[in-house]
Amino acid sequence: MLERMNRRNFLELGVAASAAGLIPRGLAAQTTAVAQRAAQASADASATPIQITNLYDNVYLLQGAGGNMVLQTGPDGNVLIDSSFAPAVPRIREVIGTLSKNAAAGPGILINTHWHSDHTGGNEGLHSAGFTIFAQQNTRTRLSTAQTLKMFHVNTPASPPGAWPAITFENALHLWRNGDSLDMVHFDPAHTDTDIYIHIHKANVLHIGDVWFNGFYPFIDEGTGGSIGGVIRAVETALALADTSTKIIPGHGPLGSKAGLQKFHGMLSAVRDKVAAFKAGGATEEEAIAKKPTAEFDAVMGTGMMSPDNFAGLVYRTL
């Protein structure tokens, strides 16, 4: 998501944002740390091994430096969900070559769950290798134009044309590939306004992208349509689709289940309700954060990309 900025940019960003009053001064260093972590993950992507988990006969979870990917193989060709960071493309292609059930069928289809570059950074490289990119229309719009990452107060340039989805949809698109049916469905704005889920029916696999950060407080992109309420509604949609055997793929973190997603929903709802009550009572963002609305969850959820205070601030601002 932030791979085109360097470490010095991030340090300057945190200082400038705090000085300008764009974010509470106490959160500036934490915001900078989040950005630095994302940049480092991108830089390390070429050297980060991809872990493979077999989800079904011909469906695999691929986990590397960026967002979680899913690969379906078979006689109709490969279907890959998300493309990690650009430097990861050689490793991704190597894994696909190893797992592919029918190399003669060609590279196949790449589906983006949303627009952030830890999920779309490999688009251009995989497109050059022959993949056709599918996504919700807003993903093409955001990849093809300059964007602002509001939390980090930074503008990002448009991605190269080769990274743009060639086939887009507004609400839903259905595919039949390799003996299974795949639904691609647009969530209402949630983590961003580009989020979709991909449901692979026979395999009982549901990829929900960054609607779920499994084991961590989520990042919500408030500048591109994200909100706490939207994330909660999207999680509820996913829960309605899943059964106790569904393999639910989060954008980040380990393979999930319906029970795990239910716990995530409970956390989101509890923090939202507390922050909403503080805000309704007249608390400023800094005052609401100081009341520690996430405290009961911090031991489990507070060690990831988003600090408890950063997450509480996002909740406050997107209510």
Where are the predicted features?
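Conserved beta-strand hairpin/beta-sheet module of binuclear metal-dependent hydrolase folds
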Residues: 51-98, 196-200, 205-210
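Active-site neighborhood of phospho(di)ester-bond hydrolases with catalytic His/Asp-centered motifs
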Residues: 81-83, 108-115, 134-137, 207-209, ...
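N-terminal secretory signal peptides and thylakoid transit peptides that target proteins
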Residues: 1-18
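C-terminal regulatory/interaction regions
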Residues: 11, 15, 283-319
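Metallo-beta-lactamase
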Residues: 77-78, 85-87, 174, 181-270, ...
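Active-site HxH/HxHxD metal-binding segment of metal-dependent hydrolases
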Residues: 16, 98-174, 193
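C-terminal segment of N-terminal export signals and the immediately downstream linker at the start
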Residues: 25-62
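Sec-exported extracytoplasmic/periplasmic mature domains
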Residues: 97-101, 115, 128-131, 236-243, ...
